[in-house]
Amino acid sequence: MSDLAPHELRILVAVEQEQGFTAAAARLGMTQSAVSHAVRSCERKLGAVLFDRGRHGARATDAGARAVTYARRILRLLEVMGPEVRGAGAGDAAGEVTGPLRIVAFRSVAAHLLPPVLARLTARHPGLTPQVRIVRELGRGAAGEVADGRADLGLATLDDSAPPPVPGLLAVRLFEESYALVHPQGHPAPRGLPLVDWDENCGSYTRDWWGRQDWIPPATIDVEDDSVAVSLVSQGLGMAIMPRTALLGAPDGLAVTGLGPRPPTRFVGYVTTPELAGTAPVRALIRELRALALPEGLERV
């Protein structure tokens, strides 16, 4: 099997992202026939059909999706290789860290914990350019984005079991947070209120506890965002059971009540690839994450 060249990897990524040869060609400044020829060449080299062609465009096959994942990760390593080598050659004396840093995180962490981290990070390393995307913690979540080569580091919920959420990644816990009952302030019986819930709320870390609570009713309102759930509770539409990070910056008129001596908890940490874990931008971000002063209700682990 012949090796794929970097330009071929870029073509595979573009075709997968644009879901078609014509759009990929326009993005890359190439002709459609050149892109089609390059994809056929990649398929011959790899011995697999990478894209299903049709009127719908070009959709990655299972083999193609795997190839594109490797392509993204290899291209990212090529991108960071120059700065890493130059830093090593200079003895890293200046501590200069430059270039893009791709971060994915779920909403509450991105909104409340990342800003001070990135403020310190960019103050120390002005040449660093963080790029932050919000990813819902459903399915493979932030870890899947890292595994697929779309992000350098993800801030994710980590189960109480040791293995990372996606095989092949490095996963490190940063803190543990408890869940609490949030309800309108002054309500005499908040546990009797209707339940407002959101679909990222119940992972394996809460499911067992939730199942043992006979006082929790079925959800009256289901939403897709924890901030919407908090807003609905603030308007008197019910109560919610939420992790502490989701309650940071909550509006006035809310009360937060503990769930007993052994409330459900979850771990939050970072995931990255073994290859990127040692790069200067990722190391710099991890240092700032570890130095973050945690709000009340979050305990470092």
What are the functions of these language-model segments?
Residues 102-104, 177-182, 186-206, 293:
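Short loop->beta-strand "edge-of-pocket" segments that line small-molecule binding or catalytic clefts
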Residues 98-163:
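Central regulatory/effector-binding core of bacterial HTH transcription factors
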Residues 157, 191-218, 235, 278-286, ...:
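Secondary-structure junction motif
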Residues 137-142, 147-150, 157, 201-257:
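Hydrophobic hinge/microswitch elements
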Residues 187-189, 237, 257-301:
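A late-sequence structural motif
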Residues 21, 43-62:
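A short LG(V/I)-centered, amphipathic sequence patch enriched
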Residues 13-31:
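Short helix-boundary/capping micro-motifs
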Residues 163-173, 177, 228-277:
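Beta-alpha-beta core module
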